[in-house]
Amino acid sequence: MKILVTGSAGRVGSFVARQLLGEGHRVRGFDLKPSGINSPEFDEVVGDFDDAAAAQRASNGVDAVLHLGAFMSWLPADRDRLYRANVDGTRIVLEAAAAAKVGRFVFASSGEVYPENKPEFQPVTEDHPARPLSPYGVTKLLGEELVKFQGRVSPMETVILRFSHTQNASELLDPTSFFSGPRFFLHPKIRQQEGFGNALAVEKLKALDIGEEALVLTRNENGRPFRMHITDTRDMAKGILLALTHAKAVGGIFNLGATEPVDFADILPAMAKKTGLPLVAVDLPGAGVWYHTSNARIRETLGFEPEWPITRMLDEAVSAWTRRQT
Ligand code: NAD
């Protein structure tokens, strides 16, 4: 098969592209940035999803599209770019794929369409109402609608995957990581909260600062530690490849992520023990993050079995962290 992987320079897209090449497929990338992938079976279009000519060049001659690229930002200043990349961009990539008579189109949506941070019931299944509370979540829901529309009006098969939060294991203990830095480390968290303009959170976090880097256990205003899914990129790739090939995936919407959520009350002390970093705890204003999303549908329908629970990811994260210290 020849497969177009959008977001081929990104975390998930670059991994999936390499995996497909390893399985003997031909792969084309499509991203704003070059992927750095070097293989005779790989070519790429460097361009913007909302550039129709680039999208058409990317789609021509491929059997399937994995639309894994998107712009992720929660900053108000990025709003226009967010909608252009994730809504207009997805529409244009979809239309190019349909015009090129692509067989199957797999779309990377997000748990933020529910939203997972404020669920009406748990575990969150695919039947939970989709009522996003962030502009990013809105762009993903609009993307889903565009995918469903194309699935109705063209013969192209479509699959929607609602992604869990996703990390490479090596990112978990990297204070410079876009997600894991502010999630687990005090100094990046202070900078993040300053960026969001959350003065009270900044004040509480700064009061814990002992001048050296520390891990931070985040709890809500009642002292309940955060809980959320964090899924390894390798498990996400397994689910994406099932969506690409499985007959029962067609027309489906599936939550894709780890089976169990990560309890910060468990993982932060384990991180501190394994790294020797100091651990502080903070109660931030608000209800906080505390969710469990069900992956039962993709397990039961497509046979998805994740292999990288957080404990296994953490072992690898500690090795990467130790290497960075020397
Ligand atoms: P990533 O940021 O590592 O990669 C996204 C890629 O898309 C980047 O290489 C970027 O250059 C490219 N891109 C962005 N805007 C573009 C545009 N307008 N035109 C062309 N290329 C563009 O993200 P990731 O972690 O690999 O995420 C993959 C997918 O999963 C995305 O669709 C994301 O929205 C979704 N998702 C990710 C998470 C997560 O926690 N990582 C959670 C839920 C959903």
Please identify what each model-predicted range represents:
Residues V65, A77-F105:
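NAD(P)-cofactor binding segment of oxidoreductase domains
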